[in-house]
């Protein structure tokens, strides 16, 4: 009896030899992880001693900048830079480092400046980052 059919069957079902998921086959776990990552950052932003600032208080210009698809990456970089000037923000900084994989690919190059965050101002940082995360949530399917 030949072992060839059994060997071929094993090759077909072996997980190590199956095709890896590609960009055209999105992983559900990646989407879930991005959603969890956004939620974790918001939870950290809402912890005392921070006041629970409402991002509805953002001016229209800041909202427009944070919502622009071609500014998603530059805005994230602005938050990554700003978090370094804040005290006790190591957990948020760590999560922001993981967030780039959750950004959709920009279709156009940024033609304007990203969001400005007041140096060392938790409330400004918190309000703008919450709004930014909300725009990412809206743009990405869950």
UniProtKB/Swiss-Prot annotation:
Signal sequence region: 1-18
Residue ranges crossing the lipid bilayer per the database entry: none
A matching Pfam family: IL3
Keywords: Cytokine, Disulfide bond, Glycoprotein, Growth factor, Secreted, Signal
Residues with attached carbohydrate: 33
One GO BP: cell surface receptor signaling pathway via STAT
One GO MF term: cytokine activity
Disulfide cysteine pairs (residue numbers): 34-102
Domain of life assignment: Eukaryota
One of the record's GO cellular component terms: extracellular space
Keyword Mitochondrion applies: no
KW Disulfide bond (keyword) present: yes
InterPro entries assigned to the protein according to its UniProt record, in alphabetical order: 4_helix_cytokine-like_core, IL-3
Function description: Granulocyte/macrophage colony-stimulating factors are cytokines that act in hematopoiesis by controlling the production, differentiation, and function of 2 related white cell populations of the blood, the granulocytes and the monocytes-macrophages. This CSF induces granulocytes, macrophages, mast cells, stem cells, erythroid cells, eosinophils and megakaryocytes.
Family: Belongs to the IL-3 family.
Protein name listed in UniProt: Interleukin-3
Source organism of the structure: Callithrix jacchus (White-tufted-ear marmoset)
